[in-house]
Amino acid sequence: MQREPLSPENDALWRRLWEIWQDNDEEDVVLDSLILDELEDEIPELRDRTKTALAYLQRARYIQYRSGVGEDGLEPILFDVYEPR
């Protein structure tokens, strides 16, 4: 499967999501506001654009997530991340 190349910030997000998902033994991960804030601190270019970047990564077939109800309302739930090479 050929995927389009990612911008540096989207690539950094994808690789970080892979680490988070692996640390959770490939189980679903709720990306609550705390995790999203941490990601924005780690990747400042994504500030206020993290959810847009998640949607892009899903459309480009790098990750899979769904929306679910969490403590802060609707939150993305990461359930698959394709391994970075």
Where are the predicted features?
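A short, conserved structural fragment
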Residues: 58-68
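Short acidic, hydrophobic short linear motifs in intrinsically disordered regions
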Residues: 24-41
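Short alpha-helical segments that sit at the start of domains
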Residues: 1-25
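Short amphipathic alpha-helical interaction segments
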Residues: 44-59
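Short, cationic-aromatic polyanion-contact patches
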Residues: 68-85
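Amphipathic alpha-helical interaction segments
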Residues: 12, 34, 52-53
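Residue-level marker of regulatory loop/turn positions in helix-turn-helix DNA-binding domains and
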Residues: 6, 28, 46
